[in-house]
Amino acid sequence: DALRWTALHSSNALDICIKMVKEILLLRQYAHTNIKIIMATRNFELEDDVRLRNWISEINSDVKQMELKLFEPDQIKPYVSQFEDYDQLSNEQQNILKIPLWLGIYMDLANDLGCAPKFTTKLDLIKSFIDDRFEQLTDSHGISTANSENFFNEVINLMNQANKLSVSSTQLSIGSSEIKKAMISVGLLTEQNREISFRHQAIHDYAIGKKLYSQGLSSPEDFLHELGSKNQQTLLKREHLRYALAMLYEADERAFCNCIEAVLFHSEIRFHLKSLVFSTLRHIENFKAPLKKLINKIISDSDLAPHFIRLSCSGCPTLVQYLSENQYLSDWLDEDDEMQSKALELLSSVSDKAPNLLINELSKFVNRSPEWNQKIYNCL
């Protein structure tokens, strides 16, 4: 993971990992050496990278897979219950607080405010956190918002130029030591071995995402330019893109759609960024004309359509409903090939949430043949 997606990106990272693992397995087998290797990868890579998936399958007998899971409600409630009833939060809010990073930011804010922070999305939480810290810089340290913003942006720009999450304190402008100390005091920055970093990586991601958002409002071309070349499209950019798209959707749906289209249809954009775009689409509830037009274009593209169906539509009643209303599902069901199977899988994925969709689409196939009856039964 680190070899492949950090600023020190290596195109042959998987080859290096395969060679390392092979050598370790040989040591275990012939030298009886009790040595193990831990390899971290993200779910989307394990699912979408065919070569990685096949390699893991080949050495499956020597692999123990461990999934890093989210907090359970019983682990979260003792913290949140100090400020509000966790069970009364929306599903989206509860899911955000299951992630340790966001629960930590929530608690920091709640303790400072003396009450539960108002939020709907991660974007709300991190923006509130930064605003709260800037207020503390003014109230407790006498530092103006303008000076805080200038220093904050200086740190962000230095990190961005170096493609790193930290910056040497020797690179900071002369006379900034007091602001630096104040930002460490209020919990915006940390310093170790003269290296400055943000207390939460989400602060850095939000700041870069905001810049990407500004470029997206300007034009899709500026948006792509800010994402950078393939070498620069690290996993860090994934989080920046997530924030930028959330802000674009709130501000201007047409600009949001134009930027999504630019990312999906550009050959020089890495798939892990396109994968994020597909995941973003599944969380949109209301489709206006620009987004409907874009969805139709994606479905008509033979390369993008399978990923859209799997990553955006599967399990998403809103999108499956759209496919039904626009005759895509009925057309696919009338085909006798892979698309029919995909249509049935989509209907099955929303059978609990939208049973009427299954009735509308499958009623005409009841008793058409024993095979069709079995397919319908499987969907249910």
Predicted regions: what is each one?
Residues D1-A2:
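Walker B catalytic acidic pair
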Residues W5-I35:
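Conserved Walker B catalytic segment
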Residues D15-M20, F71, N147, L236:
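Soluble or luminal CAZymes and related metallo-dependent hydrolases
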Residues H32, S90, S168, I269-R270, ...:
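Generic structural signal for alpha-helix starts
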